[in-house]
């Protein structure tokens, strides 16, 4: 996403290209699968970015999006100020409920909430995040862009199987940890 990083990557492969913030530099239906891992919370137009991910994947191909869940309502030891504290967790819960109602009543008005980046030293993870990503909206925008959502999980890395099942078995997965969503573009 940044010019200097693309230049570094070009030393290894010529397949890296700069994303201009609007259009991914690939043709329609180019890839069998695409993924955005910890990217969505940093782009200026996340709704359009999801549409672009779907555009460049072939029909039947998979889209994987993993981002922090900034609307956590459950959890301890959260790393970002938006996730920390009982007051924020209550506000996050209320905001998610409002968003769910909005998705049903007025889908065209749904947008990810934006955040101001945090400027502090030392830099902390996701201080530069500008989008309050969450599973509900990632799932919603994938479905709006002609995808079937296959999985929504709160774990974005390997955990012991019994713990993984317990964390991702029920609806609480939408209000914990991360937003890990796998979808398939409809044929």
Model regions and ranges:
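Class I SAM-dependent methyltransferase SAM/SAH-binding core
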Residues: 1-23
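A conserved beta-strand element that flanks and buttresses the S-adenosyl-L-methionine
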Residues: 35
